[in-house]
Amino acid sequence: MADTLEFNEIYQEVKGSMNDGRLRLSRQGVIFKNSKTGKVDNIQASELAEGVWRRVALGHGLKLLTKNGHVYKYDGFRESEFDKLSDFFKAHYRLELAEKDLCVKGWNWGTVRFGGQLLSFDIGEQPVFEIPLSNVSQCTTGKNEVTLEFHQNDDAEVSLMEVRFYVPPTQEDGVDPVEAFAQNVLSKADVIQATGDAICIFRELQCLTPRGRYDIRIYPTFLHLHGKTFDYKIPYTTVLRLFLLPHKDQRQMFFVISLDPPIKQGQTRYHFLILLFSKDEDISLTLNMNEEEVEKRFEGRLTKNMSGSLYEMVSRVMKALVNRKITVPGNFQGHSGAQCITCSYKASSGLLYPLERGFIYVHKPPVHIRFDEISFVNFARGTTTTRSFDFEIETKQGTQYTFSSIEREEYGKLFDFVNAKKLNIKNRGLKEGMKQSYDEYADSDEDQHDAYLERMKEEGKIREENANDSSDGSGEETDESFNPGEEDDDVAEEFDSNASASSSSGDGDSDRGEKKPAKKAKIVKDRKPRKKQVESKKGKDPNAPKRPMSAYMLWLNANREKIKSDHPGISITDLSKKAGELWKAMSKEKKEEWDRKAEDAKRDYEKAMKEYSVGNKSESSKMERSKKKKKKQEKQMKGKGEKKGAASKSSSSTKSSAKTMSESFKSKEFVSSDESSSAESKKEDSEDESGASPAQSSEDSASGSD
């Protein structure tokens, strides 16, 4: 066997970033060289305590644990390389390379185990995930929760920010499981610890974001905010800028600390720490350092004993420790003499401060916009009232900020400031126009162009012209719209007849001088009588045999009274639940007894159904025969009625034919007179009588034959 093993393209995970390198195993130990950073991990063979082989995202991985608790992980091995590594570990390190699979059940509950520098979350004996405690930057506790925050790697595309564990309470007295969990994490985590005494402490300072009162402890490398509910440790390296801003009432001061990354409270992130001070509040401050240390460290910026306004002391100490300048408002002065402008942003009102290199808005939510990231600004007239305007800022990234409800008196000062800073103004040249527009709205000018008024004037002119035309022709009655021929056609179409419109109706219409719209005749359609939909619903036959019950229902009917006696006063629903629980808990042998009873009941039911169906068939055949007989009788009666109708129709037809023949054969020279007409009528009457008698006799004979 070779004395060394070398592997290329092996990856090491560093705070979420996978760094490739070369891994070399020899008799002396394990060496990994990072290709990106050049960092070398050297693990002595005598320090190795355990080796684990497992399947990971990048193929297979090797996990090495040392005797002093350090853990090293290397990924990117092929499955075929296990035998080679296992033999090498046995031969040179006298260790068994154990195979362990990760749990992939997807459960979010399990057991947490602390081993060396690792926190392992296990389900049963299989680990789900592992957290290197050296990556933990913050550990905070809640009622039943522990939240871990992690150091970030700038090279990682996706980073794990925090993990929250729910720790259930235990019955043990004097042991808080949440606190015990947090202490296990903090003992190995790379968390900022408050070692030594604070340089100074400011008690009960009012904080607007995050809201509350906090004690601020100043340490050499970080700032500690201690409140009733939350604690924050803020390293000075995360402080970007400091602002000291006077309130508009000239009695208060804002001290703003800009942070990156922000502090977090639950899911809320605070990029700005805003403290509010009263100008009248004074303090005497003594630093917890001797004068030589103060002089050496701060080089005259601070002294051991200081006194003055509280906001001055806080800002002075922060400036010296953070080593950053404090930004104050520039030479901008508003209409009221203040260095800020009252406005609204989103749903809250606040103060906008024009600075020398940007704008800052306090306090809810705080916004800081630098001039170098502004694309352009825009002055817009207010939407609800003309006594205010909106100030819009659009950044080069496309983000838009709208500060609304700014008093119109501030417009001139703000416009001059923006112009002096050489910012791009989207609607440049509207300064004079905007001032003029306010005057016009205060007292409208006749020269102002109003599109709506112009349109109304045009409509008025058109109405006047139409009125003049109608008055000129009011004495004459015109019949241009009246067309008798067309009207006749309409009527003919509507009533489906050849009748023409009467002259009297036409005269009446012309007299009135108005043409009423013709009413359309309703076309009556012959509707067939609706057939009643007879739903043939088969009623349940009371004589039919009842369906058999299941094994559970047989058991329940037999044991219902027993359950009631065991649980007096139990409701119906609770009884059903209890019965279900008892049935589930019953052994298989006892259930088989009731299953047999259910099978017997089923067989009896099938037998009864066969007998019932045979009886039903005989009854149904009798019913069918009676129905057929009834239908035959109805048919015979219907045939008799039809014969009678035919006879009556034939008699009436002979009568009408005789009459038409007598009327049709008349000569052209025939002159009608009273006598002739009377004689003719008599003749017709006699003919009618003679024609009726034979018809009657024929009907009688027909009835006799029937």
Swiss-Prot record:
Subcellular location: Nucleus; Chromosome; Nucleus, Nucleolus
Disulfide bonds: none
PROSITE patterns in the cross-refs: HMG_BOX_2
InterPro entries: HMG_box_dom, HMG_box_dom_sf, PH-like_dom_sf, RTT106/SPT16-like_middle_dom, RTT106/SSRP1_HistChap/FACT, SSRP1-like_PH1, SSRP1/POB3, SSRP1/POB3_N
Acidic residues: bias regions: 474-496
Compositional bias segments (type: Basic and acidic residues): 532-544, 587-610, 634-645
GO BP term (any one): DNA replication
Annotated segments matching region Disordered: 458-551, 587-706
Taxonomy, superkingdom: Eukaryota
GO MF annotations, alphabetized: DNA binding; histone binding; nucleosome binding
Polar residues bias locations: 693-706
Coiled-coil regions listed in the entry: none
Keyword vocabulary terms for this entry: Chromosome, DNA damage, DNA repair, DNA replication, DNA-binding, Nucleus, Transcription, Transcription regulation
Pfam families named in the record: HMG_box, PH1_SSRP1-like, POB3_N, Rttp106-like_middle, SSrecog, SSRP1_C
Function: Component of the FACT complex, a general chromatin factor that acts to reorganize nucleosomes. The FACT complex is involved in multiple processes that require DNA as a template such as mRNA elongation, DNA replication and DNA repair. During transcription elongation the FACT complex acts as a histone chaperone that both destabilizes and restores nucleosomal structure.
UniProt similarity note: Belongs to the SSRP1 family.
Complexes and interactors: Component of the FACT complex, a stable heterodimer of SSRP1 and SUPT16H. Also a component of a CK2-SPT16-SSRP1 complex which forms following UV irradiation, composed of SSRP1, SUPT16H, CSNK2A1, CSNK2A2 and CSNK2B.
Matching PANTHER family: FACT COMPLEX SUBUNIT SSRP1
Full protein name: FACT complex subunit SSRP1
Lineage: Eukaryota, Metazoa, Chordata, Craniata, Vertebrata
Gene name in the database record: SSRP1
